[in-house]
């Protein structure tokens, strides 16, 4: 049986590695984060809304962010609710589109229906290569929406359609999602 110290070694290593990725993200992404904030402020000041899309864990992050925008991030800083829609939540819409048009269009068709010029699409993809995310970002941009991509590494194919890309400097999807 391993000693308690042996069990702690991988835990410490993982947590220190995660902290290193967060520090590297702060150094590499601060300017792009500020640009994304500027897009969001302009969107909300113009009466727009934020749409969010992603798959798997990224879908969960979309839902969490939408909830925080509609509700409030901190009670210490009161503000009105902000319009935000996670395109990952309506199972009837998702399955109808997937069945009739293919999974690659589950976000694109929702952006086509809901997105308006001045809105912002936040797309989350650890690789930037998810076909349904790429199509959504391309559609949003074609419709006059601004686009923010949260991704890792090189940013993948979605990068070509993003107004702002926040690229976590890590290749491991778990570390990208944590940052």
Residue ranges with predicted function:
Residues 1-28:
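Generic N-terminal amphipathic, Lys/Arg-enriched alpha-helix
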Residues 28-46:
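A short, well-structured juxtamembrane/interface segment
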Residues 42-115:
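Glycine-rich, small/polar surface segments that engage phosphate groups of diverse ligands
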Residues 49-53, 117-128:
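A short, small-residue-rich loop immediately preceding and capping a beta-strand
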Residues 137-143:
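Surface-exposed amphipathic alpha-helices with a cationic face
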Residues 151-179:
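Short alpha-helices
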């Amino acid at each position: 049986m391993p000693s308690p110290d042996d069990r702690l070694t991988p835990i410490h290593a993982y947590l220190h590695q995660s902290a290193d990725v967060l520090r590297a993200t702060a150094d590499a992404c601060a300017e792009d984060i500020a640009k994304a904030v500027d897009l969001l402020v302009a969107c909300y000041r113009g009466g727009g809304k934020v749409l969010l899309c992603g798959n798997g864990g990224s879908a969960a992050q979309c839902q969490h962010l939408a909830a925080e925008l509609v509700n409030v991030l901190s009670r210490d800083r009161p503000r009105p609710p902000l319009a935000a829609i996670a395109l990952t939540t309506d199972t009837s819409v998702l399955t109808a589109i997937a069945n009739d048009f293919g999974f690659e269009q589950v976000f694109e068709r929702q952006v086509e229906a809901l997105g308006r010029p001045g809105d912002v699409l936040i797309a989350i993809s650890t690789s930037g290569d998810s076909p349904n995310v790429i199509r959504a970002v391309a559609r949003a941009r074609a419709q006059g929406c601004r686009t923010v991509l949260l991704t890792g590494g090189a940013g993948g194919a979605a990068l070509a359609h993003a107004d702002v890309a926040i690229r976590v400097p890590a290749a491991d999807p778990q570390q990208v999602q944590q940052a």
